[in-house]
Structures are given as structure tokens and as C-alpha cells.
């Protein structure tokens, strides 16, 4: 058994209504999505936003031991596929989003929040098929949104199949909001993309890139067909670059859509039901442990994957 430092526990209320606990396990490969406030085009592709986001991503990934596999920065949201090697994903996302928000406020002369008030969508990718599909999904997102005809046409930050595990971004420190005298903010940082560890072992690098390329081609075809059926006109890279950051996306989107916590990929019915059962068991064990903890039993054992209660209150979890 182990327990973590209670830290700021005495300042945190634990009787307020809680969202579902997030399952955080070391070595998990996940897809992260977060939107801008009211879908403003605050991340419109331009050199300054590119530099800010990549620099911050590189610094935070290095600090928290996160492996970056894929990234697409749309004008209204981010997509990341990463592996949480050290079980620090919540810390990583908190720092990344705070720094990106502060920098964006400076660049865009923006008052108020930059990110949507909903917490980040974090989808655990439980199978090799799921990782391949979500890597391709992240790449195809600009096509699905009707912004460009092909993933390779996106003028903002993106990663293509042939760049997986190969590309290294070298980013100079943005001017204006990172203290050059603070060693936390080096003059230059490198962000080297890695291959998802389990897939590199089972597929091999070249076969994995080919599998993602095939899946990307499939998703691009479906996206182009959907854009055509909706009667949309593809905006194009040049018009994307000219979007006002203060303009909002106008395409229909439900206010409260589904927010899945895991993905298994197509044709994985058995794995899906197993994952549902495991998630329900985790949440049930968490609720039962929380009730006992609130009743004063500080020695109660929380289920493996408990993160926030470990961090804030030092609860006991299995080793």
C-alpha cells in the first residue's frame, strides 16, 4: 500500500457534488480534446500561436514525462494523442492549458477565459486498433470540419502518418511572457514525436505508419463525403489563415454531447463490454471508499487509478 502527500487537503472541500472520478493509470495512451470558449477561433493558424503552443507542449511534456505521438491544433480546439508514462497526465494538462491560455490572452489581447468551462475530454485508448483510429482521427479533423480537402493541407499544427516517431520540432522561446532569466524557460526546446510504445513493439515503425496512413485515407474519404452531403463549401487554407480570432464557429454542435472515457476501435465488441464492466467496478469501488473516508475511516483503500484523492488528501491505494 502507499499514500501520497496530503498537500493542500485542508483547503479543499470534499462534501460538494462531484463529477465522475477519472481513472488515471501509468502507461495509458489517451486522446485529449479541449475547446476554446464558445468555439472562438482563438487558435487561428499563425506563426505566433504555433510557437506558443509547441513551446509550451514541449516544456510540459518534458516536465511531466508525457510522450507525444500526435497533435492537431484546430482554430477552436486541440487534439493530442499522448502516453502518460509517469501517471502525471492531470498535472500535465493543467500546466499546459494554463500556459497556453495566458499566452493566448497576450497574443490575441483577449479578456477572460480562453478555454471552455468543461474539463478536458480524456479518452483512454484500450486497444491497438483504437490508437490507430484516433491518430488518424486527429489528423483528419480539419477535413471533417470542412476546412481543407486533405489532412496535409491544414496550415496549422498537425502530424502526418510519415512523421510519426520521426519528426522533431525545434521551438524558440516566445517573446513577451516567458521570463528569459528563469531556467524553466530555455531559449530553445525540442519536441520529438514518439511512437506509442505497445504499437511500436507489435507492429514495427514502418508497418504502424502504413496502418495509420490507410486509416487516415479511409477517414478522409468519409469526411469529404459528409461535407458534400451537408452542402458545405470547403474553406481552404488561405481563408483559414484569415479567420478573425474573435469570430465563433457557426456549425451546429450539441451543447452537451456524449463524452466517452475510453475507446476500443471498430469490431472490438467483447473488449468494449469488458471495459464498461471495469469502469463501473472502479466507480463503484471509488464511491464506496469515498463514503467510508467521509465517515472518518482514513485507512480505507481506494481503487487503483484513483488520482485526485491521492494527490489532495493522501488516501491509500494499492501498489
Indicate where each model-derived feature is located.
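Short catalytic/metal-binding and nucleic-acid-binding patches
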Residues: 1-319
